[in-house]
Structures are given as structure tokens and as C-alpha cells.
């Protein structure tokens, strides 16, 4: 691997948005480099694995990427630092090196929001998307009793994956009200593909106005306590998968000076956040793969100067932004979910920091100094979203190294010319 590399266009993330961006930009002849920490393109939604059923659309996009001679892809690669303007230090399993670029598109996606509740650290409790990823990677669930709880369509998708591999779904607990879910369903004919998909994912164990209260068990999960439409019930289960929506992955954007709006990267009509720096997909807000694909294509066209091609995609983007708005309104989290944790409920699993140790602090910095919350191995990737939701604390921009790195990789910084 060369100690340095140059890209006319550097794309971070090879999910739907990153793939669409690369393919939109490729006809320009620009030298395009894609980085992703997964082995194959597709992101979380099209994650590959021994038990994965990758959609035809994803396979076609992979084939088109493979056919483009001006797209170079680095799999299993992480961004470590930004040592200078338009320059990143990156690392894979074999080496670390510097990449300089002219234009950058961030397609860093989103991660699950996990809210703490009693028992959530028991073995057998995972994220809803996490369970789906584990099953695709080969986790056997044949005959296991599964409860899925939280909010949003990901619950149904996770349940469908589990059922396909032999799990027994005991309950799908959706915290949104029946009125909100029915109102969302009534709008789905505006997006026929989503309307048909909703029929294929429907499950008779689905309940609205239902949320988790506690995971039950001693050494591992044995059951779950739910508040179901005003009543408290308990179900025996072998697995509990919870997901309370998605949080945009904005940390790298923050470090590179991108504008932030709410919890997402802020972009203009061309998907630009600052000069020569673009973003697309769920790092700019959750809206599904269709919105990510069109945003990625707009960013790709705009980054290589084909503004007319980008402009022609604006109506399609607006259509899927309408879907995203309806989705986010229908599945907005009930404020009572903020009170699930008890004083002794762990919030930061890495540093064993309970909820009671965080109440009374005014911001992240104060809480870290007092408790080390968010300073463990995951660097706040799990507890950070929960703390922001529970207390409203805004995370500060990450400091390098952004991911754990080898000493040899950090030594590449010696090759950085002085600013």
C-alpha cells in the first residue's frame, strides 16, 4: 500500500448513498476512492454474511462499481485523523496511509439508538438492527423465543429476518400509538413500494402503544416486562432486541468542520455542507435507502460539477423526503421512555456508570470528569446517543485518533508536510 494516495473525489462510506455517489460521479472520469469499514459495499441495510439475502438491487450496484476502472475501493478501512486540509490518515488491517483529496462526500450512515432500562445489559439483549446483523453473520436462532421492542419499521424488518431463520416471535412492541401508526399506514400508498413492503412485513404479534419496562433474568435473559396498552405483562423469551430509532453518524463530519443541524449533518440543495465537502444518506437524517440513494447521486453529480444532472434529481429527493418526514413524525419517541432507567441502571457499559451518577450534571464534560461516562472502549458510541436523548447534552467534536490505531499508522503523520 502506498504511503500516500490522491483522490479527485473521496467517498467515506459504501452504503446506498456512497455507492450512488460513486456511480453518479464515475462518468466524469474523476479519480474516485471509496473507503468503508465493511468487507463489501452495501452498508448496514445490505449487509452481507453467510445467512444474508442481499437484494438484487445491491448486487447490481456492486457489479456497476466493479466495472468502473476509475473507482478504487478500500474495504475494512477506518479514518484515524485529519492531519491537514483535505487530507486524512486511514488504516486497514495491513497498513496505514495518507489520502489527499479535492472533494469529499461523507456517507457515514447511522447507528441504533439504545435507551437504558433495567436488565438491558443481560446476555441475550441486543439492538434490533444488531440482532438482524448477527443473524446475517450466522447466529443460529432456530426455535428461540424472541421479543422485539422499540420504535419504527426496523422492528418489523428485524422480526422478519428472525422468523425466516426459525425464531419464534413472541411480541413486536411498538411504542408509537395506534393512531400514529394508522396515520402513517394511510399515507403509504403515496410510495407504492413501501405500501407493498408493509404487507410483506406485517406480523400478528405486533402491538402499538407498547414499550419495554425491564429485561428479566439473573445470569442471562429469561423474560421481559412490557407495558402493553396500559397494562403490565411479562413474557418468557430467549432474546430481546430493542431499537429506538437511528442516530446519524456525524462524528467525522464534526471533526472536519461540517455544519450540524439537530443531530445530523446540515447540507444545502447540492448536498454540500461546506466548500468541496458534501454529505448524503442517513448522516444527514434518517429517511431510508431510497432517500439515501438519491441524495448520494445528487452529491456525486454536484461534486464533479454536473449540476444539471443533480438538479434533475431534486423532485425525486423531495418525494422521499416526504416519506422521511411522515416516518419521523409517526414514530417520534414518547417522553416517558426517558424515565425507563433506575438510579442503578447502567448507562455507560464500558465504564460501569449508572444513571444515578449522571443526574445533576449539566453537560458531557462535567459528567466525564466526575464519572468517566463515554470514555471507555466504545468512546461513547453506545451511551452517547442515550445520554443526548436523556439529558440533551450535545457531544463535542471527537479528537484524533477517531478510532484505535497502530503506532505504525500514527507514524505516517511524520510524512505530513507542515501547515
Model-identified regions with their sequence ranges:
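FAD-binding core/adjacent interface of flavoenzyme oxidoreductases
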Residues: 2-9, 47, 58-145, 223-230, ...
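Beta1-alpha1 glycine-rich phosphate/pyrophosphate-binding loop at the start
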Residues: 2-3, 7-64, 143, 148-149, ...
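Residue-level detector of alpha-helix initiation sites
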Residues: 15-16, 40, 112, 152-154, ...
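A Rossmann-like FAD-binding core segment of flavoenzymes
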Residues: 65-90, 99, 165-251, 259-261
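Active-site-proximal substrate-binding core of FAD-dependent oxidoreductases
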Residues: 270-273, 301-340
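A conserved FAD-binding loop/helix module that cradles the flavin
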Residues: 280-315
